[in-house]
């Protein structure tokens, strides 16, 4: 929550002078928990208000009614955590409805769309949307350059890499380091020796395991481009402490 939800809301509230938010997500625990944290932060820390909140079943493909509500309520920001195939329908229908995410008049911030999802959505249908992630394929650093090159050599030039893919890549390397520190494959010993494990070869940059077994990482905001990639607009100068359920937000 600290790295993806709170950091992105702080940024957009300042950068876009946003005060009103419309929360939309798929109907399961992650979007609901994320939006509970988002609502608390918006109302109690940013001095803003939530003008709408809607959830849709997984696989839902008809968003015309909520798009009409968004038009009517004119929020400064649509905060989206729609997942899976529903993303294809949602963003294509936004585009068809004339809601232009490249304009200053309509801001959409997603915590659930990576380069992988854009393959299905189509870059032209999501251009201008803002995404909050720790990793984007376009990151300009030697670690990522080597990672992208190796990934495409294995999976083809058309393959893309999103935040979740990079996380899956990091997992075994972090586990390997923890096993070596523990000198054992025993689960409890590996858990005990995990906090403090560092990795300076991660495509996203240097990361470190926190006491809660999440990763210290930089938060990043990027803008979706028509070619399916993201242009990074902002990243925190320092690693952010990971906290999935910050005190006062439960």
Provide a role label for each language-model segment:
Residues 1-250:
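Extracytosolic ligand-binding ectodomains
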